[in-house]
């Protein structure tokens, strides 16, 4: 008996061709979490017309008093859009080309992830794994949006370790034979996007075959000889770890109300996502920086020195062979290093200090920002930042295989504007 594939074709819903891409698509909800003005500009760009902005809850609003009303409005918009806006569909995958501002073209395949083949539980080794530690307190707010929702729309980006370019790139080579389902410029400097429906049974079989090969024991043992014989890893979460975890948590909650037969086919068992090849030149793995608010830069530096002394971490000024980073405030920036770090990665050592500091300064708040210019701007407004060193993408899968998960928010795939924009939808409430 063939096992259920971990990534498979879906009944994907799309808006009317009359709705411009620049109005319809908006960036992932977990971006610009300290920049309310960005989301106000997004609302202006949508111009009151149908937009995926109406189907999501930007995290900048998570702590607002009206969050329940916002979620109710989202669910109402989903019902309306299902009837009146999502008038087209593709049965299969969507092959996507995203042209970034730099001119690089990022290729991907949108399909559905089997949540039964994924777990964020510590120590679990399913075919699909998170790339970072899952903070369970971040799941309930996202579950509140998904619970009872008619639709999902994905910003999750999965990664395949496919150096031979067997999964996605061959589909791109045949795009002229495919039905184009959308194309246009994305709002607010998001670049250009185009999508083609992949519905030909021969192409679907080709994708399935390539995925099976990537997830085979033979391929796993060849790629990761240090872990030979271990449970194969087919896909890793690149962006959207907590969104996929929330979908999983909602599914586990719903499963309890379903018969075994219903569990095999209920659409909420799956979650839409885009799969990309980590080896693509268009995939950049960048560090995520830490920014503290409501703190004084000098006080943070003194606390850091005291913490380092108590943990024998060997902090020093200047760039050392071990873990280097930049501590930046409103008026000054210093390169510092740990000569005897307490964690394998710089980000892990910094996170250990931040946890210590936050426990002693209840007024402090921390945010995680991908873009260095955005970090510098926050520093000019009074923030204190820990700027992380570069992250080597070649170590991503090895880190997951050998070490489980990376520290929370270790890396980001590209700048904020390059994140996945919501484009496709899928019904998760009833039969597809």
Which residue stretches match the model-derived regions?
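Charged substrate- and nucleic-acid-binding regions of tRNA-handling and nucleotidyl-transfer enzymes
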Residues: 348-432
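Active-site beta-strand/loop microenvironment that shapes enzyme catalytic pockets
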Residues: 213-258, 263
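Structural beta-strand/beta-sheet cores of well-ordered domains, especially the beta-sheet scaffolds
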Residues: 51-53, 154-156, 233, 268-274, ...
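N-terminal extension/subdomain marker
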Residues: 1-190, 195-199, 221-225, 391-406, ...
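C-terminal structural cap/anchor segments
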Residues: 307-375
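Catalytic or ion-translocation cores adjacent to nucleophile or general acid/base/metal-coordination motifs
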Residues: 241-305
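Short beta-strand segments
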Residues: 159, 237-238, 274, 387-389
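Glycine-rich phosphate-binding "P-loop"
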Residues: 187-210, 338-341
